Amino acid sequence: MALLTLLAKNATAIFICSTFASLLFYVVYQRYFHPLAKYPGPFLASITDLWQVYQYLTLKQPYTLTTLHEKYGPFVRYGPDKLSTTCESAVSIIYQKGGRNMPKTEFYDAYGAAHPNVFGMRNETLHSVRRRHMSHSFSISYVKEMEQYLDLNIAIMKEKLARYASTGEIFDLKKAFHYYVIDTLGELAFSQSFGVQVADDESLIPPVKEHSLLAAATGAWPAMLPQLKKWLPLVPYKPLRDLFQGRRACADLASRCVRERLLDLADVKDDEASLRLQRKDILTSLILAKHPDTGERLTEMDLETEAFGFM
């Protein structure tokens, strides 16, 4: 018994010492020998992604990163393997010349890796094809065609501002512009305003913030992302449940918009003259777009994921 007790104590001691030594080795490596060790940044950020998760959950991430750049300069290490830069010359290197050498990271998987849209798509080949599907929707000619719908929402906003000015009522200018942007995006993407400006009702805004916060916070911890996706929906914590509820609401709205638009186009002849008569919006352009090589159109699932991304 004495021998077993001694072995048990030694095993526990060995485990504790091994764990401590491993952690110490990891910290020393991250701080002094990692390829990003030469770049400045917070100590905790250099050893764990949980630092960034905390920044997102407390809604401080953009402000903290700005402060860090003011303190350290154009390059800041904000994660064990993450580097932030404000260097203008890096933009073309990363986004234009980087291409396949600098693909999107696992962070984007949090935005829907099971069936990703053009925003979260990490496969460069598929991403390139999808961008070609959508190219017309972001052309100058298309934007000019949509000016009438922009003008419509501008008129609503101008009328509200004029009313506030005549009555002397105090109002939130930032919120007024936010409402305008939301309704305009609805017109551009789905040919329908969300009616936020007219109703002056913030609850009509799609709960995009909830989805974005959930994706950012979980995507910031890529090593645990599969487990987080699996188990977080089961956690009985109301603020967390609210985030998942917001994500589901956005997905349901995207699906509904796609179904309604497909129904509207169901009886339209598939010829250039008939299609030209249809009201233009980003979703319709995507529905009618064909694969540049095969001529195939996107599936309903593809359309729903892209509509989800429009929000």
Which residues fall in each region the model found?
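Short, histidine-centered active-site or binding-site loop motifs used for metal coordination
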Residues: 51, 138, 290
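Cytochrome P450 heme-thiolate monooxygenase catalytic core
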Residues: 104-111, 145-311
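N-terminal membrane-proximal hinge/A-helix region immediately C-terminal to the signal-anchor transmembrane segment
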Residues: 2-129, 144, 151-160, 180, ...
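Alpha-helical structural context
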Residues: 71, 137, 188-189
